[in-house]
């Protein structure tokens, strides 16, 4: 989609492969991410922030408009980032009609771990050497004592909301999620599956349900 490849190019220091396709009207070139978008694959790469979240949301809505019945695959390699940006993606994933299948490649930490576990039931995956990390939201504010108190209450409210969301998708209680996220909690792919963040560790494409003609 317009603007998406520009963001990827910036993050990859200008290095991005191009794909050349033969059509009845001659050759057509795509950047690799736009080509994969045609296969209903979205990449969530790098820090979760407002600009990236807007691009992911736009792609989810576009693919729903293209075919509201066909699954969308969300590939995640992210250290996390801004909570509100992550929740914008989360709400859109839950809002649209197609199932969103999630796959962790590399890492899914913090807000990215929340998005990983928010995939459709039975369609949440990790590759075997991926790492997943969950923790409580980070907060830091300077200012008058009253303002600090206001932001502290907001941070606690956000934490409760995130705990409830993760509890819903992992089938655990919010209290257990709160205990398990007191500090950075790192997991292997297998541990993430046992915890309920994902449904399966993928060792082979044939069982992934992510196969394409590429």
UniProtKB/Swiss-Prot annotation:
Subcellular localization(s) per the UniProt record: Cytoplasm
GO cellular component, as recorded: cytoplasm; endopeptidase Clp complex
InterPro entries membership: ClpP (IPR001907), ClpP/crotonase-like_dom_sf (IPR029045), ClpP/TepA (IPR023562), ClpP_His_AS (IPR033135), ClpP_Ser_AS (IPR018215)
One term of GO molecular function: serine-type endopeptidase activity
Keywords: Cytoplasm, Hydrolase, Protease, Serine protease
EC number(s) recorded for this UniProt protein: 3.4.21.92
Active site per database record: 110, 135
Transmembrane segments: none
Pfam families (alphabetical): CLP_protease (PF00574)
Chief localization: cytoplasm
Listed GO biological process terms: protein quality control for misfolded or incompletely synthesized proteins
Top-tier EC class: hydrolase
Catalyzed reactions per annotation: Hydrolysis of proteins to small peptides in the presence of ATP and magnesium. alpha-casein is the usual test substrate. In the absence of ATP, only oligopeptides shorter than five residues are hydrolyzed (such as succinyl-Leu-Tyr-|-NHMec, and Leu-Tyr-Leu-|-Tyr-Trp, in which cleavage of the -Tyr-|-Leu- and -Tyr-|-Trp bonds also occurs)
Described function: Cleaves peptides in various proteins in a process that requires ATP hydrolysis. Has a chymotrypsin-like activity. Plays a major role in the degradation of misfolded proteins.
Subunit structure: Fourteen ClpP subunits assemble into 2 heptameric rings which stack back to back to give a disk-like structure with a central cavity, resembling the structure of eukaryotic proteasomes.
Family note: Belongs to the peptidase S14 family.
Record protein name field: ATP-dependent Clp protease proteolytic subunit
Species whose genome carries this gene: Legionella pneumophila (strain Lens)
Gene symbol of the encoding locus: clpP
């Amino acid at each position: 989609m317009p603007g998406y490849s520009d963001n990827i190019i910036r993050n990859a220091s200008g290095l991005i492969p191009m794909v050349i396709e033969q059509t009845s009207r001659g050759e057509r070139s795509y950047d690799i991410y736009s080509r994969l978008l045609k296969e209903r694959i979205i990449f969530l790469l790098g820090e979760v922030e407002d600009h990236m979240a807007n691009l992911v949301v736009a792609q989810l809505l576009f693919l729903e408009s293209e075919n509201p019945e066909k699954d969308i695959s969300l590939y995640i390699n992210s250290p996390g980032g801004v909570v509100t940006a992550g929740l914008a993606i989360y709400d859109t994933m839950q809002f649209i009609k197609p199932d969103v299948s999630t796959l962790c490649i590399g890492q899914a930490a913090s807000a990215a771990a929340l998005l990983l576990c928010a995939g459709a039931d039975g369609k949440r995956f990790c590759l075997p050497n991926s790492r997943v990390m969950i923790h409580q939201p980070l907060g830091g504010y300077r200012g008058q004592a009253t303002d600090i108190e206001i932001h502290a209450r907001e941070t606690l409210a956000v934490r409760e909301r995130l705990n409830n969301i993760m509890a819903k998708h992992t089938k655990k209680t919010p209290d257990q999620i709160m205990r398990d996220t007191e500090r950075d909690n790192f997991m292997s792919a297998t541990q993430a599956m046992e915890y309920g963040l994902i449904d399966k560790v993928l060792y082979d494409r044939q069982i992934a349900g992510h196969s394409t003609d590429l």
